[in-house]
Swiss-Prot record:
The keyword Ribosomal protein does not apply. It comes from Clavibacter michiganensis subsp. michiganensis (strain NCPPB 382). InterPro entries: Alpha/beta_knot_MTases, tRNA_m1G_MeTrfase_C_sf, tRNA_m1G_MeTrfase_TrmD, tRNA_m1G_MTases_N, tRNA_MeTrfase_TRMD/TRM10. S-adenosyl-L-methionine binds at G111, L135, G136, D137, Y138, V139, L140. It catalyses: guanosine(37) in tRNA + S-adenosyl-L-methionine = N(1)-methylguanosine(37) in tRNA + S-adenosyl-L-homocysteine + H(+). SUPFAM superfamilies: alpha/beta knot. This is tRNA (guanine-N(1)-)-methyltransferase. It is found in: Cytoplasm.
Amino acid sequence: MRIDIVSIFPEFFGVLDISLLGRARQSGLIDLRVHDLRAFTHDRHRTVDDTPYGGGAGMVMRPEPWGEAMDEVLADDTDPVVIFPSPAGEVFTQAMAQELSAEPHLAFGCGRYEGIDQRVVDHTATRARVRLVSLGDYVLNGGEVAVMAMIEAIGRLVPGVVGNPASLVEESHSEGLLEHPSYTKPPEWRGLAVPDVLRSGNHAAIAAWRREQQLERTRRVRPDLLPE
């Protein structure tokens, strides 16, 4: 999978060189390309923003550097999905992560200030598949944190990135339910014991216990995930 990121803070994504995604990059499973938006400016101040038409607080990101950045990202004609993080977008879910993990090319545009000039989104949509995506009903300072979260969620679903694919099936949201509690050694710690069923060796009983724990936890914490 190829992933392009456009941001005024390219150094923000250095963390993607470590852990599972770092190894995925080294092995060629993920081709990550980070583009500095300011590299596409042509004034000595490397300006990427200006005051909004119609007035209002804050600044809006200018279309010219974004247009040139998108020209570079889209130059290979690979039909990517271009994602702009936005509180006005559709909510990111595990199902969306699964869907996007099957795409050969994703691109992310990290907005800042009061956002990106709408013409950038509109023009990009004539050249690629564009989606506005939100992490939830809150506002961040910029798109970088949201993009990091999405890449983490999507990248680990790319075949070969996670060593044991079975572990992905047991996680929260993989079946629309929250994950069951997990335990390891020692069998007792500070007066708290591991549930007997998990030490019984009875695989059917363990599976039933885990399923009930998933349902109970989902009913208590995220009842909206359960069918009506």
